[in-house]
Amino acid sequence: MIRDLTRFNLGRFLFDRRRASGAPIWSALLIVALLVAGPTPVLAVTPPDPVLEWIGIMNTTVLAGGTNPLVSTRVVALVSASVFDAVNGIEPRFQPLHVKPAAPHHASQRAAAIQAAYVILVDLYPAQTATLTAHLNTSLAALASTEKAQSIAAGVAWGQTVADAIWAWRLTDGIAPPPPPFLGVQSIVGTQAAIGAWRPTPQGLPNQLPGVSGAGPQFATMTPWVLTRPSQFRLPPPLALNSPEYATELDELFKMGVYSGSGRTQDQSDLALFWAGNTALYWNRIASQLSAERGLSFTENAHLFALMNVSMADAAIACWDGKYRYVFWRPITAIRDGFTPADSDPTWIPWLDFFPGGTPAHPEYPSGHSTVSGAAAFTLAAAFGENAAFTIDSETLPGKIRSFASFTDATTEIANARVFGGIHFRTSCVRGNMLGRSVADYVSRHALRAKGDDGNGDEE
């Protein structure tokens, strides 16, 4: 937890705040700027939207920290939930997620949002404190021309309070301590894993290193943000190995997901790589673009990003419940080992295994990318309409831009990308998308509702 160690005097407002690292939150230059601003604004220059600004900073910080897509769903929810409760706590328009409104009436909402985002990011990425503090000082300095120093300081204090409360709340969500390594059925019986069961998959090319233990098993039992339990929307089991549907999907993977000699077009190969990045960050960039185009206010953005990112976090938890309930094998295992000897090809390698990340190190069903994307798409369609057009870039295929005429177009392409990458069966993607949408629908009806709106029911 962050505690006050150093006192700053901003005019007549005493404000205590220093990070645990020892780096002061407000630099001397910023303090001077606030004091010069005086009791009234001196310029009518609207500062940048602090929500969009710090969503961008969050995205950059997550990438710089090398955070994997699963853990990133928790990161973006922590940041957005803190920002929302900080903003909403000053002028309540919605039900709070966790922190009840108790801010001074004169506190700056913008300063509260900035501080809340900063606190969470420094808690999560202490190695980036210097960079984040520079962003903080720039953001707060931009407020000095339009808001009173006392209002800014009160907003910062409230933002800190909210972020500390959200941080303490989620420290007990089950993220730590990590459970023992999960190696599939082998870890339980000490023998060869059963047909159809996940086991560690080869990692890295050209030499296909031994597999690693399953990633994030604690997410399968993590306390959700809004859902009543991880299994609330648990999917039915994956396709039976002796079903014609499974045979069709296995054949599709064998032909379309292989690294060499596949039936893919160049565009299909590209889109598999394009969507191999961090799911939560794709959708935060999409939401930022649409928000800017539609002219949402920063308070509307605080609500939108909290709703989307909390939905994605709960979708990830629901997805991991399914992964570690069914423990279904990855295509590389299914094709190399085979349901029968006639089905097997021990030389088969997925297309994405030629790139960093490759086959994800956790059970196959359902698809995490599709589940989280389904949640985001549902939330954004409710805000902007299903047929909102947008473009998106990718950290895994720099310089490329893909365009979409609807959210369904995007989630359909994401499903194709996982199949063409050779890492998911199609049913896993289709059902994962449905799971994510179910989670987001529930979150939208049971959390962050407008004041006086009970969500029209308590059903699950």
Q: What residues fall within each predicted segment?
A:
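RTX-like calcium-binding, glycine/aspartate-rich low-complexity repeat tracts
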Residues: L29, E459-E460
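N-terminal secretory signal peptides that target proteins for export/translocation
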Residues: M1-G22
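Bacterial N-terminal signal peptides
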Residues: W26-G38
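Acidic/polar surface patches and capping/hinge elements
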Residues: V45-D458
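Sec/Tat signal peptide C-region and signal peptidase I cleavage site
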Residues: T40-A44
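Residue-identity detector for glycine
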Residues: G11, G22, G38, G455-G457
